[in-house]
Amino acid sequence: MRARLALRVSGVSYEHREVALKAKPDAMLRVSPKGTVPVLCVSTGEVLDQSLDIMVWALEHNDPEGWLPTAPDAMAETQALIADHDEVFKLHLDRYKYPQRFGLLEGVHHRDAAAAWLFTLQERLQQQPYLSGPRWGFLDAGVAPFVRQYARTDRVWFDAQPWPKLAQWLVAFENSDAFAAVMHKHPLWVSPEA
């Protein structure tokens, strides 16, 4: 979702191909053998198959809302925060959402471990309106889809936690035009080879 958010805000033209991960098209596997989404094939022949790389690529082409940090060292700090999120929070999120996949009876321990990371976001949001600063930006788009997944796992529990700024931030994201646009359902792409 974060790659689609950046592609949308950048206005870069691209062809969206929705695929079923249970039946990955050969055309996709030829360009990105790892078989995960998203994958962006650029006209130069370059293949980007990491969502953050796609975000940077799209916003370097056009960043009308100023999502990319411009202050010295700000992008490095932003990428470090997202890396921490991806390595720590997402690990716990997956085990909280899908404990059976990891041989667990329940995911409460991982819910609580992920919550500790979310409290760092709450602290940041107490100082400024968005994670990126005075306006929505790269850091917000980089983590919001995963915070949404976490909240949706048990929304009643999430809403009862003492993180009002985080909850407001998430609701604003869920009610945004960008979110509505990227959540639009696309028909599955069928390869002409099929």
Walk through the language-model features, giving the residues of each.
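GST-like domain detector, emphasizing the conserved glutathione-binding G-site
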Residues: 1-112
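Residue-level "edge-of-site" marker
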Residues: 20-22, 163, 186-187
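Phosphate-coordinating loops and pocket residues in cytosolic domains that bind phosphorylated ligands
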Residues: 30, 175, 184
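Long, charge-rich low-complexity segments
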Residues: 185-194
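GST-like fold's C-terminal all-alpha helical module
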Residues: 77, 81-175
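Phosphate/oxyanion-binding loops and surfaces in catalytic or ligand/nucleic-acid-binding neighborhoods
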Residues: 61-65, 153, 176
